[in-house]
């Protein structure tokens, strides 16, 4: 992000490995980098329960300048007012946001469960509203099909080649580490 070389990236961390905490500490680090000129960090989730969970997680560590978008209008207002903070929102709050809200390049979007939300209208509206933003997808189950492809949405390098993952911690790695117990059926 500091160098501005890659505008997208995909992080595959298996379920239960701490994606929310990784997002939290990533947001914290990005907010403190002077080179980013006080960026806006947008945390995007796809379910109301995840919205509440991640808001609670961020609140527990008292990440400064963190707020939750409570409505479509609330999110639109926060973005239009050039708020330099961490904003937590569901993807659905981008419904009917066809206008450009922020032109700045120091807007960084961390998308939880990226494999589920980036093929539809709301994702297109989010990208249209924030055309110069950085988009980083977090997933435990990337999809690699012709009609839905997490790698295509987040793994393209400036030269058009696909960079599969910025970081990879899959189920095999979790089992090897002892963080996940394998299940055997008889």
Q: What is each stretch, according to the model?
A:
Residues 1-186:
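RecA-like P-loop NTPase motor core of helicase/translocase proteins
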């Amino acid at each position: 992000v500091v160098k501005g070389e890659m505008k997208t990236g995909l992080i595959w961390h298996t379920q239960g490995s701490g994606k929310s905490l990784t997002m939290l500490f990533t947001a914290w680090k990005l907010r403190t980098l002077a080179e980013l000129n006080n960026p806006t960090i947008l945390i995007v989730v796809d379910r109301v329960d995840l919205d509440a969970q991640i808001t609670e997680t961020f609140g527990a560590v008292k990440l400064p300048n963190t707020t939750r978008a409570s409505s479509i209008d609330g999110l639109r207002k926060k973005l239009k007012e050039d708020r330099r903070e961490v904003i937590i929102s569901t993807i659905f709050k981008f419904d009917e946001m066809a206008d450009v809200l922020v032109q700045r390049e120091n807007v960084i979007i961390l998308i939880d469960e990226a494999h589920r939300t980036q093929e539809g209208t709301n994702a297109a509206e989010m990208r249209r509203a924030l055309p110069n933003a950085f988009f980083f997808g977090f997933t435990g189950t990337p999809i690699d099909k012709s009609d839905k492809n997490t790698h295509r949405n987040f793994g393209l390098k400036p030269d058009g080649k696909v960079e599969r993952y910025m970081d990879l911690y899959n189920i095999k790695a979790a089992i090897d580490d002892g963080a996940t117990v394998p299940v055997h059926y008889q």
